[in-house]
C-alpha cells in the first residue's frame, strides 16, 4: 500500500486510493483477483489487497473465493507437481524448510548442470525461438548475470546495446505514447525489440540511447529514448537515489521558470526525464 518512488500518483497509498475511488460512486463493487503464492509487494510479507482482514479494516463486507482446480496443465506435468508442492508449503506455513523438488518421472521438468546450461539455452533458442524461451532467476542480480552471459556467449553481442536485443520495460511510461492511438501507455513488463540504435550519449551524469523499437504484443514500431544505466543495475529499475539525481539534475535546466507548477509542466514534457527504463529480457 506504500508507494516507494519519489514521485507517485495520488496519496502514494494505492489500496487506499483505489478503495476510496471505487466506493465514492453509487452501488459500486470491487473485485480483487490475485495469487497468494506469488511475490507480495516490495518490502512486504503479504499482499494487503488479498488479505480479508485488512480489507475489513476499511469497513467493507468481504467475501473470499479460492480457485483450486488446475485446467490448463497436464495432470502428469512435473512443473505442476512441483509448483503445487510449493503452494501447499506456503498455505501450510512450512516454508522454513524448502520442499525438495521431484525431478524423476516427468518429461517437462529436469535438472541441468551448470556446464550444460549454455548449450541447453542455445538449443532451446534454435528449436523454439528466443521469444518462446524464458530463463527465470532467483534475484535481479542473477538476472543481470544471465542476460549478459546470453548476449555474450550465445548471441555473440559485444556492444552495450545492439539491433535485435530484447528489452523489458522496467517502469510504466505515459510519455512516448501520448500521440499514439493504439497504446495508452507503455506498461512495466512489456517486451520490446531493438530495431535500430541511432545514437548513444551521456548527459546529466547518465547514459541515453535513441532507438527504434518494435512492441512484441502490438506489432508496432516507435522511436524512443531509453536509459542505458538500468541495463546493468542489480535492481528491478533505476534505484531511488539515482531517480532523485536524474530528476533534480534535469530540474536545474528550468531554474528560469518562476513557479513550481511551471517547472513541473516543463519536466512532464522533458524526454530525458521521461526516458524509458529498460532491462534485457532474456
Question: In which residue ranges do the predicted regions lie?
Answer:
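SF2 helicase catalytic motif II
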Residues: 1-19, 29-32
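Conserved helicase motor core of P-loop NTPases
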Residues: 17, 21-30, 36-187, 193-195, ...
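Long insertion/accessory domains within large nucleic-acid-processing enzymes
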Residues: 229-282
Amino acid at each position: 500500500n506504500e508507494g516507494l518512488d519519489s514521485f507517485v500518483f495520488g496519496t502514494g497509498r494505492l489500496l487506499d486510493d483505489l478503495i476510496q475511488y471505487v466506493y465514492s460512486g453509487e452501488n459500486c463493487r470491487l473485485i480483487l483477483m490475485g495469487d497468494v503464492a506469488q511475490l507480495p509487494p516490495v518490502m512486504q510479507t503479504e499482499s494487503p489487497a488479498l488479505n480479508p482482514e485488512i480489507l475489513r479494516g476499511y469497513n467493507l463486507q468481504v467475501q473470499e473465493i479460492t480457485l483450486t482446480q488446475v485446467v490448463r496443465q497436464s495432470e502428469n506435468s512435473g512443473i505442476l507437481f512441483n509448483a503445487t508442492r510449493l503452494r501447499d508449503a506456503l498455505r501450510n506455513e512450512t516454508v522454513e524448510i524448502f520442499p525438495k523438488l521431484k525431478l524423476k518421472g516427468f518429461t517437462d521438468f529436469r535438472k541441468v548442470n551448470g556446464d550444460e546450461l549454455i548449450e541447453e539455452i542455445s538449443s532451446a533458442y534454435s528449436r523454439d525461438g528466443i521469444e518462446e524461451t524464458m530463463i527465470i532467476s532467483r534475484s535481479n542480480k542473477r538476472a543481470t548475470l544471465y542476460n549478459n552471459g546470453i548476449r555474450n556467449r550465445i548471441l555473440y553481442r559485444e556492444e552495450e546495446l545492439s539491433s535485435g536485443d530484447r528489452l523489458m520495460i522496467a517502469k510504466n511510461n505515459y510519455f512516448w505514447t501520448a500521440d499514439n492511438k493504439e497504446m495508452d501507455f507503455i506498461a512495466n513488463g512489456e517486451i520490446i525489440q531493438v530495431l535500430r540504435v541511432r545514437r548513444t550519449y551521456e548527459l546529466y551524469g547518465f547514459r541515453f540511447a535513441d532507438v527504434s523499437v518494435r512492441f512484441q504484443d502490438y506489432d508496432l514500431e516507435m522511436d524512443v529514448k531509453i536509459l542505458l544505466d538500468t541495463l546493468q543495475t542489480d535492481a528491478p529499475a533505476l534505484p531511488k537515489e539515482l531517480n532523485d539525481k536524474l530528476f533534480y539534475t534535469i530540474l536545474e535546466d528550468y531554474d528560469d521558470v518562476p513557479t513550481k507548477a511551471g517547472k513541473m509542466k516543463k519536466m512532464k514534457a522533458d524526454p530525458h526525464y521521461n526516458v524509458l527504463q529498460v532491462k534485457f529480457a532474456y
